[in-house]
Regions:
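Conserved ABC transporter NBD signature motif
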Residues: 63-71, 79
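Helix-to-loop junction immediately C-terminal to a conserved catalytic motif
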Residues: 55
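Conserved catalytic motifs of ABC-family nucleotide-binding domains
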Residues: 155
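Catalytic Walker B motif of ABC-type/P-loop ATPase nucleotide-binding domains
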Residues: 159-162
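Conserved ABC ATPase "signature" region
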Residues: 103, 107, 113-130
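The feature captures the beta-strand-to-loop junction immediately N-terminal to the Walker
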Residues: 40-42
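H-loop/switch region of ABC-family ATPase nucleotide-binding domains
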Residues: 194-195
Length: 238
């Protein structure tokens, strides 16, 4: 359930420009503990840029991101440590094993026992027996699961995910949804970007459509995906 103590993520007036190109145009994002905001939209809408700004990996041209009430930035390492980020591109080092990659993330985020934390994270995503593999030897789906373990190893308060179901077969996708439901029930705040709403529909507390760098829609999840999809396509194609 949402916390009465305020949101985990509170971002206001986010703008991001590349020269004359405005990619984000005054976007507000607020997510409480136990909530999942699922974001969809057409290619080029600004979804990945939004996640990078929320994660502190890109600076907004205007606006502010606060995690647990603290502005995200170089001078706020505690706010950054509260974030887990799953990119649509691999963030793993090919010269390290999967286990070593996850241990490295645990150390960077200050885990008390990085090795044990890495083993728990790999087990949670079904990779307990693949820790000695190098990322280059993994399939796209296994690589995605390793990236999710890396993002979860430090028990973040906020998880940002960009197309996390890409490359996952049906059993692995089901396992990921079950894991995310478990973490949400324990108070995780989640922002999940997807091109395929059906993959994440059951997880969503709220759904949003980003189009042209703005929210075209942001509301509690409707009950019926089939009834929602015509609205989504009308907004995304406008």
């Amino acid at each position: 359930m949402p916390s009465s103590d305020g949101p985990i993520l509170d971002a206001v007036g986010l703008e991001r420009s590349f020269g004359a190109l405005r990619v984000l145009r005054g976007v507000d994002v607020r997510v409480h503990a136990g909530e999942a905001l699922v974001v969809a939209g057409p290619n080029g809408a600004g979804k990945t840029t939004l996640l990078r700004v929320l994660a502190g990996l890109a600076r907004p041209s205007a606006g502010e991101v606060r995690i647990l009430g603290v502005p995200v930035g170089p001078s706020a390492p505690d706010a950054r440590r509260a974030i887990g980020f799953v990119s649509h591109l691999s963030m793993l080092y090919d010269d390290l094993t999967v286990h070593e990659n996850v241990v490295l993330a645990a150390r960077l985020y200050g885990a008390r026992d990085p090795g044990a934390a890495a083993r728990r994270a790999l087990e949670a995503v079904g990779l307990a027996d693949r820790g000695d593999d190098q990322p280059r030897r993994l399939s796209r789906g296994l690589l995605q699961r390793a990236s999710i373990a890396r993002a979860l190893v430090h028990e973040p308060r906020l998880l940002l995910m960009d197309e996390p179901f890409t490359g996952l077969d049906a059993p692995a996708a089901g396992r990921l949804r079950a894991l995310l439901r478990q973490r949400l029930s324990a108070g995780l705040a989640l922002v999940l970007v997807t091109h395929h709403l059906a993959e994440a529909w059951e997880l969503a507390s709220r759904v949003a459509v980003l189009a042209g760098g703005r929210w075209a829609l942001e509301e509690p999840r409707p009950g019926d995906l089939a009834l929602f999809l015509p609205r989504y396509h009308a907004l995304a194609d406008a």
